[in-house]
């Protein structure tokens, strides 16, 4: 499901139900009020939610005594996407004031097939686990800016041959299904009597994703970074027709527009790649005698997306999370946490989303 428009982690306010429209003014005043008055906007249609039925799965597990009682698992699932993609219909009449005749809506693709195999066990006191999964028809959303340009009948999108203008009222499915594989390997362990704590719990996991048959289609990359260079020619600062971020966007001044174009128009990075990988680390100390009937657990976790772009990894993205958890008699818990996003991901939508939180839980 989508975060609400205007909420902290929503990077595209046109996306959620009841939000929008997409402001499509090409120059001058690009405020919502002006776009509504001039018709230079694309309205949002109703969401197309998946059916309640049609989701099921099967898992088989076996203990392998010859491998120190390791557990082998085989599983299959058929499920519907929880992540929205966006379909649309191109404008039905020519002229800027008829941009409003286009439309878009969120969809949740159904019947995603998942095959998996897992193996977990203990090696020298350390719990280790691995998993290989394969989705032959995983839906991947096209780049949002490319989709919007198709809705406005631009002759320069990846969905038509170079120079070919989409037909009036042409529909577009905002995603394509691709074979997607993932392999992950991890381990957990505990060490007693560390830094005055009763125990130190450690966890590490690394994973790699592969998208087959990617071709020239462009998936992912935050819409805030504008359009990248297409096949019709490179960015020329003296030719506004080559700009991938139009003058007047978001009421930015010409200098800011020029800087955005210089940084993005010749840059085809940020879209999903064939391969991507990263890892996650976590450490937690448990103190059982600091406070009466209370376990105090400070912890730290670290994220690093090392290489490539995909549904789970964004190259160069890093994050650190710190937390302090108080658990009283397993009935009450209070946690203070802080999360910091940073790194060298040039297409991040997270680096300005650092946050602190307080959580109180009661079990009964």
Each predicted region: which residue ranges?
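Solvent-exposed loop segments that connect transmembrane elements
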Residues: 2-44, 84-104, 142-173, 215-268, ...
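Beta-propeller domains
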Residues: 39, 43-44, 48-149, 155
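Short loop/turn motifs that connect adjacent beta-strands in outer-membrane beta-barrel proteins
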Residues: 63-71, 192-202, 288-297, 329-331
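Short sequence motifs at beta-strands and strand-loop junctions characteristic
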Residues: 48-52, 109-113, 120, 175-182, ...
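Membrane-embedded beta-strand positions in outer-membrane beta-barrel channels/transporters
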Residues: 46, 57-59, 71, 116, ...
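Transmembrane beta-strands of outer-membrane beta-barrel proteins
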Residues: 1, 61, 73-77, 131-133, ...
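Transmembrane beta-strands of outer-membrane beta-barrel pores
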Residues: 64, 76-82, 123-125, 134-138, ...
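Outer-membrane beta-barrel "beta-signal"
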Residues: 352-364
């Amino acid at each position: 499901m989508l975060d609400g428009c205007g909420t902290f982690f929503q990077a595209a306010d046109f996306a959620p139900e009841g939000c929008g429209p997409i402001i499509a003014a090409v120059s001058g005043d690009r405020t919502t009020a002006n776009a509504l008055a001039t018709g230079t906007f694309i309205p949002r249609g109703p969401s197309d939610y998946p059916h309640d039925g049609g989701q099921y799965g099967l898992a088989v597990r076996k203990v392998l005594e010859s491998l120190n009682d390791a557990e082998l698992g085989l599983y299959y699932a058929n499920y519907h996407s929880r992540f929205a993609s966006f379909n649309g219909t191109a404008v039905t009449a020519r002229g800027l004031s008829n941009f409003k005749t286009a439309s878009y809506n969120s969809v949740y693709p159904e019947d995603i097939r998942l095959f998996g195999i897992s193996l977990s066990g203990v090696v020298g006191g350390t719990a280790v686990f691995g998993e290989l999964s394969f989705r032959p028809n995983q839906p991947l959303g096209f780049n949002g800016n490319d989709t919007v340009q198709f809705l406005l009948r631009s002759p320069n999108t990846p969905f038509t041959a170079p120079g070919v203008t989409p037909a009036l009222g042409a529909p577009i499915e905002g995603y394509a299904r691709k074979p997607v594989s993932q392999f992950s390997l991890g381990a957990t362990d505990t060490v007693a009597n560390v830094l005055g704590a009763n125990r130190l719990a450690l966890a590490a996991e690394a994973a790699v994703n592969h998208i087959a048959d990617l071709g020239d289609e462009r998936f992912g990359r935050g819409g805030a970074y504008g359009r990248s260079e297409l096949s019709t020619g490179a960015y020329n600062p003296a030719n506004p027709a080559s700009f991938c971020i139009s003058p007047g966007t978001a009421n930015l001044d010409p200098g800011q527009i020029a800087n955005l174009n210089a940084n993005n128009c010749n840059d085809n990075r940020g879209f999903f790649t064939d391969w991507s990988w990263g890892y996650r680390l976590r450490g937690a100390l448990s103190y059982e005698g600091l406070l009466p009937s209370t376990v105090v657990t400070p912890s730290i976790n670290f994220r690093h997306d090392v290489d490539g772009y995909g549904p789970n990894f964004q190259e160069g993205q890093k994050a650190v999370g710190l937390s302090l958890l108080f658990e009283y008699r397993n009935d009450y818990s209070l946690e203070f946490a802080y999360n910091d996003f940073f790194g060298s991901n040039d297409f991040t939508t997270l680096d300005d989303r650092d946050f602190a939180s307080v959580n109180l839980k009661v079990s009964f």
